[in-house]
Amino acid sequence: MSRIGTPLSPGATRVLLCGSGELGKEVVIELQRFGVEVIAVDRYADAPAMQVAHRSHVINMLDGAALRALIEQERPHYIVPEIEAIATATLVELESEGFTVIPSARAANLTMNREGIRRLAAEELGLPTSPYRFADSFEEYRAAAEALGFPCVVKPIMSSSGKGQSLLKGPEQLQAAWDYAQEGGRAGKGRVIVEGFIDFDYEITLLTVRHAGETTFCAPIGHRQEKGDYQESWQPQAMSTTAQAESERIARTVTEALGGRGLFGVELFVKGDQVWFSEVSPRPHDTGLVTLISQDLSEFALHARAILGLPIPAIRQFGPAASAVILVEGQSREVGFANLGQALAEPDTALRLFGKPEVAGQRRMGVALARDVSVETARQKATRAAQAVEVQL
């Protein structure tokens, strides 16, 4: 984009954000720095990104008619999906009518469920993945697990933040894992993917940004998951030059196939020099929150530049850094946080409290960030900061 207008004027450059969580909040802040007018949308009021946007709307984004009506009302220059649960077929239609979807409507459509992206990666692009089968019924699922062998992993084809995912160690876990997958799917009961288990050394997120005709990679991010949901991440993840080159080859291949411009979070399994493709998100990734302290341009700043067609001449990484999630459990519409002075007492630490309006059960409400002389000490420092925060329900 060669020109950015004045927000809230007829010549404003408008971005409509579909999904308004903590990642979207940081994207809005970065777009605001460029004087972009931002409209935040989600299925509930007072979502984090809404709190920093120019205005907001509450709709069911899986309702194609409602989504179309809102976009035709706002006439944004850029439509930026922040989550998967969107009527992506409507985005495809809108793109064909002249709207710009970031990174592309094809990317949003293929990655909204695990089947589309897995078939693209494994069957069309020939990328290495775990062996897999899809199942619509318990009988098909049981047959898939028995064919792939134990241990294996089952996931709903549509879910986020690890919801509905299980590692099956034996046939006695089949029923419980099936029930959990049916509860955790974003669209309710339905199709699952069963994957053969890869005995990997570690898993990484390779943040890959397509911008102004180029592809640039951030340093690899290592992360630890529990029940499929990220708990901590660190950068850089140590890996062999062979494994890093293969990771970049896979990431470049899949993001080129998805097309468009923007930041992608490419998830990979690594064992020695071997690399397997796992998943890709065509947007900033939760494990990439570490870049708020580890890089001169965070993943959110990179996404904003790519959206606007601005150059990214270099990405500077500041050395070992880590993030640790602040997880809250309970019921409250007035969550408070105390002991922040203690949490920030050590040098090179930071906090992000997301401002989510309520917690019901378990919810990620913030993240602690730290830099240090090594990845291990940075992880320890970030964890200390996260644990020092007192949550008041």
From Swiss-Prot:
Domain ATP-grasp, by residue range, is 119-308
What reaction(s) does this enzyme catalyze? N(1)-(5-phospho-beta-D-ribosyl)glycinamide + formate + ATP = N(2)-formyl-N(1)-(5-phospho-beta-D-ribosyl)glycinamide + ADP + phosphate + H(+)
Q: Name one GO biological process term.
A: 'de novo' IMP biosynthetic process
Could you tell me the EC number(s) of this protein? 6.3.1.21
Task: Offer an example of a GO molecular function term for this protein.
Answer: phosphoribosylglycinamide formyltransferase 2 activity
List ligand-binding residues for ATP: R114, K155, S160, S161, G162, K163, G164, Q165, E195, G196, F197, I198, E203
* Keyword flag S-adenosyl-L-methionine: no
Q: Specify the signal sequence span.
A: none
Name the domain of life. Answer: Bacteria
Question: Keywords for this entry?
Answer: ATP-binding, Ligase, Magnesium, Metal-binding, Nucleotide-binding, Purine biosynthesis
A Pfam family recorded for this sequence: PurT_C
Assigned GO CC terms: cytosol
Give the record's pathway: Purine metabolism; IMP biosynthesis via de novo pathway; N(2)-formyl-N(1)-(5-phospho-D-ribosyl)glycinamide from N(1)-(5-phospho-D-ribosyl)glycinamide (formate route): step 1/1
- The residues the record assigns to binding Mg(2+) are E267, E279
Q: Does the keyword Nucleotide-binding apply?
A: yes
Give the residues the record marks as binding N(1)-(5-phospho-beta-D-ribosyl)glycinamide. E22, L23, E82, D286, K356, R363, R364
Q: What family does the database annotate?
A: Belongs to the PurK/PurT family.
Please give the function described in this protein's UniProt entry.
Answer: Involved in the de novo purine biosynthesis. Catalyzes the transfer of formate to 5-phospho-ribosyl-glycinamide (GAR), producing 5-phospho-ribosyl-N-formylglycinamide (FGAR). Formate is provided by PurU via hydrolysis of 10-formyl-tetrahydrofolate.
Assembly and interactions?
Homodimer.
Q: What is this protein called?
A: Formate-dependent phosphoribosylglycinamide formyltransferase
Q: Which organism is it from?
A: Azotobacter vinelandii (strain DJ / ATCC BAA-1303)
Underlying gene: purT
